[in-house]
Curated annotation (Swiss-Prot):
It comes from Homo sapiens (Human). One of its GO terms (cellular component) is endoplasmic reticulum tubular network. It comes from the Eukaryota. This is Reticulon-4. The modification Phosphoserine is found at S7, S15, S107, S152, S181, S182, S184, S361, S446, S511, S749, S881, S991. Keywords: Acetylation, Cell junction, Cell membrane, Endoplasmic reticulum, Membrane, Neurogenesis, Phosphoprotein, Synapse, Transmembrane, Transmembrane helix. The keyword Transmembrane applies.
Amino acid sequence: MEDLDQSPLVSSSDSPPRPQPAFKYQFVREPEDEEEEEEEEEEDEDEDLEELEVLERKPAAGLSAAPVPTAPAAGAPLMDFGNDFVPPAPRGPLPAAPPVAPERQPSWDPSPVSSTVPAPSPLSAAAVSPSKLPEDDEPPARPPPPPPASVSPQAEPVWTPPAPAPAAPPSTPAAPKRRGSSGSVDETLFALPAASEPVIRSSAENMDLKEQPGNTISAGQEDFPSVLLETAASLPSLSPLSAASFKEHEYLGNLSTVLPTEGTLQENVSEASKEVSEKAKTLLIDRDLTEFSELEYSEMGSSFSVSPKAESAVIVANPREEIIVKNKDEEEKLVSNNILHNQQELPTALTKLVKEDEVVSSEKAKDSFNEKRVAVEAPMREEYADFKPFERVWEVKDSKEDSDMLAAGGKIESNLESKVDKKCFADSLEQTNHEKDSESSNDDTSFPSTPEGIKDRSGAYITCAPFNPAATESIATNIFPLLGDPTSENKTDEKKIEEKKAQIVTEKNTSTKTSNPFLVAAQDSETDYVTTDNLTKVTEEVVANMPEGLTPDLVQEACESELNEVTGTKIAYETKMDLVQTSEVMQESLYPAAQLCPSFEESEATPSPVLPDIVMEAPLNSAVPSAGASVIQPSSSPLEASSVNYESIKHEPENPPPYEEAMSVSLKKVSGIKEEIKEPENINAALQETEAPYISIACDLIKETKLSAEPAPDFSDYSEMAKVEQPVPDHSELVEDSSPDSEPVDLFSDDSIPDVPQKQDETVMLVKESLTETSFESMIEYENKEKLSALPPEGGKPYLESFKLSLDNTKDTLLPDEVSTLSKKEKIPLQMEELSTAVYSNDDLFISKEAQIRETETFSDSSPIEIIDEFPTLISSKTDSFSKLAREYTDLEVSHKSEIANAPDGAGSLPCTELPHDLSLKNIQPKVEEKISFSDDFSKNGSATSKVLLLPPDVSALATQAEIESIVKPKVLVKEAEKKLPSDTEKEDRSPSAIFSAELSKTSVVDLLYWRDIKKTGVVFGASLFLLLSLTVFSIVSVTAYIALALLSVTISFRIYKGVIQAIQKSDEGHPFRAYLESEVAISEELVQKYSNSALGHVNCTIKELRRLFLVDDLVDSLKFAVLMWVFTYVGALFNGLTLLILALISLFSVPVIYERHQAQIDHYLGLANKNVKDAMAKIQAKIPGLKRKAE
């Protein structure tokens, strides 16, 4: 596998990388790799389902066992990527194709993955293949999948990247490298090849990082920086994916390097950040560039730590994940060793890395999945002890990875290695370099497009804490205390902020150019924001995915999004938020480290305007994650974290000035976006309130935001979005109470949460991709989503509606997202690949959005249907969540919202949701959870889901159920109301004329004909018969006159009689017919129209039939009609019309009653008569050939 990776990587990372993009999913691969890629595609589908299972089992065994195998796997890929720039090159070529078909990755992902780790489609492969590529890279470290190593490992990486992200923190360089090999995170970062210059910058910055001590994690990692430079030069030629994957490897490799050289990185990153922001702005023009910048940031994070490997990993979209995983394994070893030397926390990270490597070795068999999960959980939980939120996220990540692993089989094993390596790498990164940890985590998370990518996002979620340089460092300190000394981590917060700024800039530059055009385009729309994000946190690949760099607020939001996205890929503020939240929950429950990240997010989110509720929830969620209620925390933290995170950045003593500055810029740019980011800030604040370390992280984030604010006109816009988002957190609690996000909390509790998060992540990625494609339009769309998320307090409907608008642009993308999410659960590689493509093209944006979504879980209302379905689904179970997301997706489709829930119950997300719809999502987030046109019921569902999100884990589950019931009830009530409306109309019709018509209703007619009321029926029958008989004797004129005289005689007589009586009695009763005179007798228009329309229909039908008969349309029918008329001539001779009417009247009032009383006998004789008639007709037809033929 390494050879395959190296040969293609060499071609793509040196100079072929640019030619490779011409391949567009056609990557130079050995036949074996192509077969493996096909198998990988199939395994990815399996992984989608298995990923959830593996994630569940992975936290315990996976963490402990995976690290060891991961290290070998990482080592091999690391050597490929680190020692030889060649391995990254193949990945570069593979990513080259992804820029064009990032979303098509499902189609080509199999072949690229099989032929080479970088073979999978750059962007699609990046998402789908991330898991696959890690497998390719992993094969050396994973003996079990050797035959299908390239295929099964490649598929596995989908799981692995997430796992490595959580487990990798201890050995950050190794895990990132593996991630680089898998291309899970960095694949997405490099999926966009549009930004050629940024790639070069990233390579230069990578050189700086390489020069820095951290870069010497190992020979492989040292090579990565140089490889990154080579890749930076050649990546532009390479496909964006190739560059992205290679950057991932570089980032993973350099991650350790950056750890020791945080100061240098900070300076470099700061400069690179400015360049990136400028280039991001420039890229904003280019859609591809925007997408690329998304990848670019996450890739930057990876390229700083393991630039060459990151690039090689990114080289292939799907293969990229495998490559990244492989690199991670290699890097895990290198990083673990280097981290041990580089930082005090390194021993812890190394220990975790060793655990994960061991787990990976054991996981080489499917049993290893459980072990890895356990192993990962152990290290993660250690991390969790210090950083509960991250631990939860890591757990979720492991669950996702485990599920993916189970689905992929051999691939899963490889993926587990990748996951474990990534996790180990993330752990060591977190321990050694929080900033790099964040970058590696985010990079790993960057690939959540695939299950692996989602897992990586769990890692990213963990790194999410380091999202902002200072905040990231603080988060790393908080998150990595488990991995290492919290004090040292806290100390590194500022350094991380600086380094991350530099890394983000460098990574953004490198990744933007290296990434696929998709990501480049996405970055163009979100370049500034991404640049700020990258500056803040190179590892925060999610940051790049967030807005393009609108303002510090946006950066902060992106950081939060990265945290959320690491946990679960939820880029769309609403749909994606839910997805992020779901994935976050998954990762939290499955990965202790992942859980730590949600907790961190919550703690940061504590200060949000929604701070009281969010803080309440965030602490609860923080405690819950440790207690296993991480599900609630993610749901609460995504929304809360989004708003609180930004608010905390805003409120932090150190951060507020930068944040205010950023907010000022953002307000100038887009007040709406600023509000959106404010909500994440609020979430950050809440998180900060939850934990002092988180507060410090928030401060770091604020600092980072300030740094990122420098390069962000777009950031300003996004920060305005953040401000819009900030009100949302205030509403977001309401929304969480009434929106899918609260449901996601319950869903997070369930193991199914990982599935929904994946869907949500995919959906977010797709939405983000759409945003990336739309560039500023997508930014606006994002703002709309955020604004909508702010609306959720109003019931979540406005949010849903606005999200519908945004989803209208991203409708197709979101649908594929949810479909991808669903496909992950359902083993649908194509959809997953689409999500991967979206993730690769908009990975950074997605991650940032995911962070924002998680930060502003309330924003889940954006895709309430999808998310709602997904979240309830998560609560119920993976299948339930998936069905809910599917149902949610269906609802969205029906609603035209296409929100994320194709079959809320069946497929949910979903959910809904999820989309989703349910998601897609309850409405569904999904959501699913993502037809933008929500039905009113769907909107209601979304609101209910949001409400549930605010609830604690248990409360969220109950609330989700209640919300689902309420969602169902509103529909039923609406139907009932509609039914009642007719009854009300009938009552209205029951004015004198209405009553008359009612009496003439079918019920009244039946009662008359069956003599239910003998008196009434007798009067009607007698009067009608007398009238007809009179007509037989008198002319109609005479009859009319006599009837009128009779009535007048009666009324006049009665009137005179009453007057005489009143005069005698001296009473003042008044006119005897006063009541009738004053009564309403007018016939309503409706009644006239009703009967006239009915009569008109009959008249028209009769006219048409007569025309057909008289014009001999059918000769036989015309002859029959002629015979009938001939018979009537005889009837007319015997009876006149009145006689026939009299006979009809008598029959009408007699036949029904007789038949009712003697039904059995009559039926018997009628049956005999019919039989005789048929027999006679058959004989006649037999004798007359023409008639027989006609009958036939």
